[in-house]
């Protein structure tokens, strides 16, 4: 199966997400498996204010772009094809935002020991 990154964009900060949305995130790996796919990894990000951006030699506080929706998290899934990945990504609980799906190039990642 092919690996895809699912980028989660959300306007609501993680610490303000309703409990039912947090519970839905916790159940997401199980729901993904029910669709015949697999979650390889999932990570939530600290708020936008904690980001540091680097462009050439310039280091600045904050993300590259100021937007209403911020990158809140990312997870990696294995799916049969893009259509399957999109169907799985639609399971992502979102309050006010969306997700972006991108196929991964497939570089090997070292396993944790």
Question: Regions from the language model: what does each represent?
Answer:
Residues 1-113:
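Conserved, structured core segments of small domains
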């Amino acid at each position: 199966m092919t690996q895809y990154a699912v980028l989660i964009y959300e306007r609501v900060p993680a610490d303000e997400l309703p409990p039912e949305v947090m519970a839905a995130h916790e159940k997401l790996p199980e729901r993904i498996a029910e669709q015949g796919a697999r979650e390889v990894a999932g990570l939530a990000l600290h708020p936008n204010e904690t980001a540091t951006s680097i462009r050439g030699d310039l280091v600045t506080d904050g993300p590259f772009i100021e937007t209403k929706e911020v990158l809140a998290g990312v997870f990696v899934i294995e799916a049969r094809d893009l259509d399957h990945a999109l169907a799985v990504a639609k399971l992502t609980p979102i309050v006010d935002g969306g997700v972006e799906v991108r196929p991964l190039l497939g570089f090997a990642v070292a396993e944790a020991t």
